[in-house]
Amino acid sequence: MSEAIGMIETKGYTGNVEAADAMAKAANVSISKTIAIGGGLITVICRGDVASVKAAVDAGSKAASKVGELVASHVIARPHEEMARAFLGDTNAVKK
């Protein structure tokens, strides 16, 4: 199974929590990490199979937009193992 990483960045905490909740409920993904970037920007990262991550990011983006400010969302299908290690700090971030 090929894994993907999905990211949603919001301005403000409430939108980020709403996004993470919608992501977890919409598809079979795991919420891997949240990152407080600064200036009120927060990113939530999920992982799972490509189709599930795409569905989760779509649902999370819509949910975040309803209660806060969606800044960006993106899905990386089949990320390189080194990239996942560098950005997520997790050697098991991507399963091949």
Regions found by a protein language model. Give the residues of each.
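Terminal helix-to-tail segments of small alpha-helical proteins
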Residues: M1-K96
